[in-house]
């Protein structure tokens, strides 16, 4: 098993519902360590840069508008197979299709307000973690 890091974002809808602690408990109960964390209210420029891969997609403007609608909590998670483990915890993008007991099934309202973001691959995770955390601010433990 490989020790990996992945980026996780608790989105504005979940922050507003005050379920940050419940989501963190799920990470830790699954064996993921939080190795960096911060709350931030993204600027439009930062949200557009972070989601630039989706710039040509029809949902891009709505995604950016949503991500700047309130603060988010960003964390780097570390553990065995962290990327897949985190994606399994999140559940399907559409909370109506997410398995019971996943973060999105339990806390998300819609495909847009779907509570969490997670890296989809090791390469993406490295870029996304670097976007929010200079390497000096990520601490293995």
UniProtKB/Swiss-Prot annotation:
Annotated localization: Cytoplasm
SUPFAM superfamilies: Nucleoside diphosphate kinase, NDK (SSF54919)
Any single GO CC term annotated in Swiss-Prot or TrEMBL for this entry: cytoplasm
Gene3D superfamilies in alphabetical order: Nucleoside diphosphate kinase-like domain
Cofactor: Mg(2+)
Main location: cytoplasm
GO-annotated molecular function: ATP binding; metal ion binding; nucleoside diphosphate kinase activity
Active-site residues from the entry: 117 (pros-phosphohistidine intermediate)
Matches recorded under Pfam families: NDK (PF00334)
Top-rank lineage group of the source organism: Bacteria
CDD domains cross-referenced by the UniProt entry: NDPk_I (cd04413)
Enzyme Commission no: 2.7.4.6
Class of this enzyme: transferase
Keyword list, A-Z: ATP-binding, Cytoplasm, Kinase, Magnesium, Metal-binding, Nucleotide metabolism, Nucleotide-binding, Phosphoprotein, Transferase
Family: Belongs to the NDK family.
Function comment: Major role in the synthesis of nucleoside triphosphates other than ATP. The ATP gamma phosphate is transferred to the NDP beta phosphate via a ping-pong mechanism, using a phosphorylated active-site intermediate.
Protein name: Nucleoside diphosphate kinase
Classification of source organism: Bacteria, Pseudomonadati, Pseudomonadota, Betaproteobacteria, Burkholderiales
Gene that produces this protein: ndk
């Amino acid at each position: 098993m490989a020790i990996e890091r992945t980026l996780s974002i608790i989105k504005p809808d979940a922050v507003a519902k005050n379920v940050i602690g419940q989501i963190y408990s799920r990470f830790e109960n699954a064996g993921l360590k939080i190795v960096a964390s911060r709350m931030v209210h993204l600027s439009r420029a930062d949200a557009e840069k972070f989601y630039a891969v989706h710039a040509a997609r029809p949902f891009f403007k709505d995604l950016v508008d949503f991500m700047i609608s309130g603060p988010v909590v960003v964390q780097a998670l570390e553990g065995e197979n962290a990327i897949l483990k985190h994606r399994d915890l999140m559940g399907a993008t559409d909370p109506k299709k997410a398995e019971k007991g996943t973060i999105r099934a339990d806390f998300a309202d819609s495909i847009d307000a779907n509570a969490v973001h997670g890296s989809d691959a090791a390469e993406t995770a490295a870029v996304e973690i670097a976007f929010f955390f200079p390497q000096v601010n990520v601490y293995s433990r």
